[in-house]
């Protein structure tokens, strides 16, 4: 079986670190193709040393230069890129099989959409992308064949509960009467004690 190439957005955050931990234990089933982070250069550099991705991306050009200098100094061949366009590039590169979107907030919108448009399997921890542009994202997924898998706790629980029903045609959401309402309780975030 061919190893799956994966891009991890937000690799220095909690979800990204957890994903890399799983990959490290996956018996070479996955290859880290690219990593991205906002600003934690030291953590990202350590991840680059361990996983040897083809690309690493940070938003800021100065931080990208710092990271590039560290890689050159340590004879590491990972190509360092910067900017939102580079986030999109590592989401849509033809060699990528799977994209994990672990970036928080609205900055995940463009790389997430790029992954979906390119037909990638998308492991989505970022809820904001669907909240802001759900209809656009779902239409793009239908057109490209992209599979979107929610990996954040509550959303993944719903996915695990509902997806077997979709596979056996027990529910038809197009009629919008098989499931009238889904209620998510707040387990964290800004609305926990609201």
Where do the model's predicted regions map?
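N-terminal Rossmann-like dinucleotide-binding module
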Residues: 1-56
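Residue-level signal for inorganic ion chemistry
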Residues: 12, 48, 99, 119, ...
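Active-site-proximal loop->helix
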Residues: 18-27, 46-47, 130-146, 161-164
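Short acidic-hydrophobic, aromatic-tinged amphipathic segments that line or gate anion-handling sites
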Residues: 57-59, 79-86
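Rossmann-fold NAD(P)-binding glycine/threonine-rich loop
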Residues: 67, 105-118, 127-146
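Beta-loop-alpha module in the N-terminal Rossmann-like domain of NAD(P)-dependent dehydrogenases
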Residues: 82-114
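Rossmann-fold dehydrogenase core element
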Residues: 137-155, 181-182
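Conserved anion/nucleotide-ligand pocket segment
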Residues: 157, 161-194
């Amino acid at each position: 079986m061919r190893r799956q190439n994966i891009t991890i957005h937000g690799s220095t955050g909690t979800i990204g670190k957890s994903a890399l931990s799983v990959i490290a234990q996956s018996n070479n089933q996955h290859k880290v193709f690219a990593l991205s982070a906002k600003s934690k250069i030291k953590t990202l550099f350590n991840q680059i040393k361990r996983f040897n991705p083809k690309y690493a991306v940070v938003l800021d050009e100065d931080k990208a230069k710092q990271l590039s200098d560290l890689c050159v100094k340590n004879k590491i061949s990972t190509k360092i890129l910067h900017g939102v366009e580079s986030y999109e590039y590592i989401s849509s590169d033809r060699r990528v099989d799977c994209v994990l979107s672990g970036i928080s907030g609205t900055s995940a919108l463009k790389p997430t959409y790029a992954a979906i448009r390119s037909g990638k399997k998308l492991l989505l921890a970022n809820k904001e992308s669907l909240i802001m542009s759900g209809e656009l994202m779902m239409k793009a997924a239908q057109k490209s064949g992209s599979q979107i898998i929610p990996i954040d706790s509550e959303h993944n629980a719903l996915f695990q509960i509902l997806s077997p029903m979709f596979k056996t045609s027990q529910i038809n959401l197009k009629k919008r009467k098989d499931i009238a309402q889904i209620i998510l309780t707040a387990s964290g975030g800004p609305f926990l004690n609201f």
